[in-house]
């Protein structure tokens, strides 16, 4: 059964400096980072500030309170380490917990 939980209570952009670990060739890997204030149920999108050939972000989520999980994809035949010390932008949308009938 699906239901609508209403509008957003809060939406904000967080800047967080990250140093992801190596991603082995031709794979995806989820890595977690501490980001204070995140809550389970928050919707997040992530933006890496620079492009790296063969490297992409294919998903991000809040895996636990204060924990951002980013899934990186390495589409090359060599290992890639995302650039260390970069400031990622994370858009956080926190839904209202009030259940509605779906009419906006």
Language model feature labels by segment:
Residues 1-38, 68, 79-104:
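Extracellular receptor-binding modules and their adjoining Ser/Thr/Gly/Asp/Asn-rich linkers
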Residues 26, 53-55:
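Short solvent-exposed loop/turn micro-motifs enriched in small/polar/acidic residues
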Residues 38-49:
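Short, surface-exposed alpha-helix to beta-strand junction/turn motifs within ectodomains of secreted
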Residues 45-47, 71, 91-93:
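Residues in well-ordered beta-strands of folded domains
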Residues 56-86:
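Structured beta-strand segments within beta-sheet-rich domains
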């Amino acid at each position: 059964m699906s239901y609508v939980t209403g509008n957003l209570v809060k939406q904000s952009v967080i800047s967080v400096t990250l140093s992801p670990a190596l991603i082995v060739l031709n794979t995806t890997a989820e890595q977690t980072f501490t980001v204070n204030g995140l809550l389970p149920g928050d919707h997040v999108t992530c933006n890496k500030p620079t492009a790296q050939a063969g490297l992409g972000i294919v998903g991000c989520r809040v895996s636990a309170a204060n924990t951002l999980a980013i899934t990186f994809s390495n589409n090359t035949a060599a290992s890639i380490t995302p650039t260390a010390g970069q400031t990622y932008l994370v858009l956080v949308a926190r839904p209202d917990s009030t259940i509605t009938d779906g009419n906006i």
